[in-house]
């Protein structure tokens, strides 16, 4: 947290935050405890998922290391709400967000905004050849080779990026209107539905635990999982406290 304060000072007060993929839940709660102890808060946090967003992501990492985006986002959102910090820190979400529904789904469970790269990469010609790290991208998107860069015709691709951006936001606006909403900030977990079986559906607000403001501070936590993770978390280390079962 002191490094965040240092960056903020050196940048003349510019917004400072960090992006991460959630690993062990107590590790982020340890960061949250450090926020409380130092009084130093990031301006924003971007939660990424384990889904693997770049063509250079190792196969061993993709889908195997870290927590999926929506699970991680919900945990971070709940932790900040439970500590009365959510209104002081903005939350972004990233990880295989392409369509308007992808955007709406993360806004509904806690994100203030969504980062999207994949769709725009497709718009400029990415074919997912998974050679980003080789400098030999066949479509000229991820390369420093002047010859290969010629494959990317900027005026043509710029129009495609513009069209994708405009139409994605238009689709999001249409989804909001269909739900009777006027602004993305009105989306909540009650607007998402999951089919559990052929005869049962549930709202996300019924499927997941949502902490109330200050709940972690009072100790009266709705859900044993959050209570246990909070007890395990340490402000001075990512190593957990051992919690003895009652």
Which positions does each model-derived feature cover?
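C-terminal extensions of enzymes
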Residues: 154-246
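Glycine-rich phosphate/ribose-binding loops and adjacent secondary-structure elements
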Residues: 1-149
């Amino acid at each position: 947290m002191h490094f965040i304060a240092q960056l903020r000072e050196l940048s003349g007060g510019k917004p400072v935050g960090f992006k991460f993929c959630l690993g062990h839940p107590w590790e982020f709660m340890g960061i949250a405890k450090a926020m409380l102890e130092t009084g130093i808060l990031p301006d924003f946090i971007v939660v990424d998922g384990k889904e693997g967003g770049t063509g250079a992501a190792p196969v061993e990492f993709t889908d195997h290391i870290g927590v999926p985006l929506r699970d991680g986002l919900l945990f971070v959102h709940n932790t900040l709400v439970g500590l009365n910090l959510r209104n002081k820190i903005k939350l972004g979400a990233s990880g295989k967000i392409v369509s308007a529904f992808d955007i709406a789904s993360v806004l509904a469970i806690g994100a203030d905004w969504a980062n999207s790269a994949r769709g725009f990469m497709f718009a400029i010609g990415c074919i997912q050849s998974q050679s980003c790290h080789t400098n030999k991208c066949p479509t000229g998107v991820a390369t420093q080779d002047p010859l290969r860069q010629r494959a990317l015709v900027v005026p043509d691709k710029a129009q495609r990026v513009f069209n994708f951006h405009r139409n994605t936001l238009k689709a999001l606006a249409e989804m909001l209107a269909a739900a009777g909403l006027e602004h993305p900030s009105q989306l909540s977990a009650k607007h998402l539905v999951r089919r559990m079986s052929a005869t049962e559906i549930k709202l996300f607000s019924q499927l997941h635990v949502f902490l109330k403001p200050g709940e972690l501070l009072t100790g009266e936590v709705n859900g044993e999982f959050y209570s246990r993770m909070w007890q395990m978390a340490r402000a001075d280390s990512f190593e957990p406290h051992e919690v003895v079962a009652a």
